[in-house]
From Swiss-Prot:
Residue ranges constituting the VPS37 C-terminal domain according to the UniProt record: 78-167
Subcellular locations according to the entry: Late endosome membrane
Stretches that traverse the bilayer: none
Key words of the record: Endosome, Membrane, Phosphoprotein, Protein transport, Transport
An MF annotation (GO) of this entry: calcium-dependent protein binding
Membrane topology per record: Peripheral membrane protein
Natural source organism: Mus musculus
Gene Ontology annotations of biological process type: catabolic process; protein transport
Subunit structure: Component of the ESCRT-I complex (endosomal sorting complex required for transport I) which consists of TSG101, VPS28, a VPS37 protein (VPS37A to -D) and MVB12A or MVB12B in a 1:1:1:1 stoichiometry. Interacts with TSG101, VPS28, MVB12A and MVB12B. Component of the ESCRT-I complex (endosomal sorting complex required for transport I) which consists of TSG101, VPS28, a VPS37 protein (VPS37A to -D) and UBAP1 in a 1:1:1:1 stoichiometry. Interacts with HGS and STAM2. Interacts with CEP55.
Name of the featured protein: Vacuolar protein sorting-associated protein 37C
Gene that this sequence comes from: Vps37c
Modifications the protein undergoes after translation, according to the UniProt entry: Phosphorylated by TBK1.
Coiled-coil annotated residue ranges, if any: none
Entry's family note: Belongs to the VPS37 family.
């Protein structure tokens, strides 16, 4: 179209009346030139592809012939497989446990009938003894063998057989259900042990020595009074055996018995009796001067060596003491008399 700008009106009219000029002008346009170029490129590409296809023609023909041959072989193998399968079914049907069981039962019945017929002939005298023994023993042996086989086959037939499951017929196994995730539990706080409550000690509502009779109630404050002096072995050092001391406290000195002055503070809940400067202890052997911890004569003892308050009967069992009129009731079960120094299991003194 760029060349039409320079032409005059007369030239344009002449070109309009000339079809060759119009065709030449159309062929010289850039759009037509691009189309022609694309056409030539497509033709060249098709030509190269055709040449490549021609190169593959030989191997393709050879492969086609090989495929035809393999297909013919496959058809022959299929026919042969069908024949072998038919033979296998024929043989397997004859070897089924049920079929074999029927055949063995029939053969067993036949051999049994033959053996019975042989026995009848022998009884009638038609068969000699030697022939009868040989044939009859072999027939009966075969009969028993077949009976055993029949019984075994019957067990096999009755027993359920676990047939192998085909992989295609078995449905896929379901995955196991997901297990619930245990929730995290908060750590349990350790329980603190209960604090011991402080209880005010109070006197016991019962007598510490239930085996002794209860005396009259004292009125007013009790005055201290000594215990009577009785004989005691000089080698006595305290109760024997694995029994704990009545009151926890520091151990007494060697050679002295227990006394309230050397013991610890009284335990709460147990009533204690007022003591003098020298607490009650075990009496000394006659003639020995009392030391610390042994009973001494009180300066406040009234006339007649009698305490000003009612007393209870003394504990029986110590040598040298008068027996009370009340029958003794020991704090331990009656039985063999314990040795000297035996520590009773219960409280012996009503005031300790």
């Amino acid at each position: 179209m760029e060349g039409l700008k320079d032409k005059t009106l007369q030239e344009l009219e002449e070109m309009q009346n000339d079809p060759e000029a119009i065709a030449r002008l159309a062929l010289e346009s850039p759009e037509v030139q691009d189309l022609q170029l694309e056409r030539e490129m497509a033709l060249a590409t098709n030509r190269s592809l055709a040449e490549q296809n021609l190169e593959f023609q030989g191997p393709l023909e050879i492969s086609r012939s090989n495929l035809s041959d393999k297909y013919q072989e496959l058809r022959k193998l299929v026919e042969r497989c069908q024949e072998q399968k038919a033979k296998l079914e024929k043989f397997s049907s004859a070897l089924q446990p049920g079929t074999l069981l029927d055949l063995l039962q029939i053969e067993g019945m036949k051999i049994e009938e033959e053996s019975e017929a042989m026995a009848e002939k022998f009884l009638e005298g038609e068969v000699p003894l030697e022939t009868f023994l040989e044939s009859f023993s072999s027939m009966r042996t075969l009969l028993h063998l077949r009976r055993v086989r029949v019984e075994k086959l019957q067990d096999v037939v009755r027993r359920p057989r676990a047939l192998p499951e085909l992989a295609g017929d078995v449905p896929p196994k379901r995955p196991p259900p997901p297990r619930p995730v245990p929730q995290a539990t908060p750590p349990e706080t350790e329980e603190q042990p209960p604090q011991p409550s402080v209880v005010t000690p109070y006197p016991l509502p019962y007598s510490p020595s239930p085996g002794l009779p209860v005396g009259p109630t004292a009125q007013g404050a009790l005055q201290p009074a000594p215990f009577p002096v009785v004989a005691q072995p000089s080698s006595y050092g305290g109760p024997l055996g694995p029994y704990p001391s009545p009151h926890p406290g520091p151990r007494a000195m060697v050679g002295y018995s227990w006394s309230p002055q050397r013991s610890g503070p009284p335990q709460p809940g147990y009533p204690t009796a007022p003591t003098s400067t020298s607490g009650p202890g075990y009496p000394l052997v006659g003639g020995r001067t009392p030391g610390p911890g042994y009973p001494q004569q009180s300066p406040y003892l009234p006339s007649g060596n009698k305490p000003p308050y009612p007393t209870q009967p003394q504990l029986p069992g110590f040598p040298g003491q008068p027996q009370p009129p009340v029958p003794p009731q020991p704090p331990y079960p009656p039985g063999t008399t314990p040795s000297y120094g035996f520590h009773p299991p219960g409280p012996a003194w009503p005031r300790y």
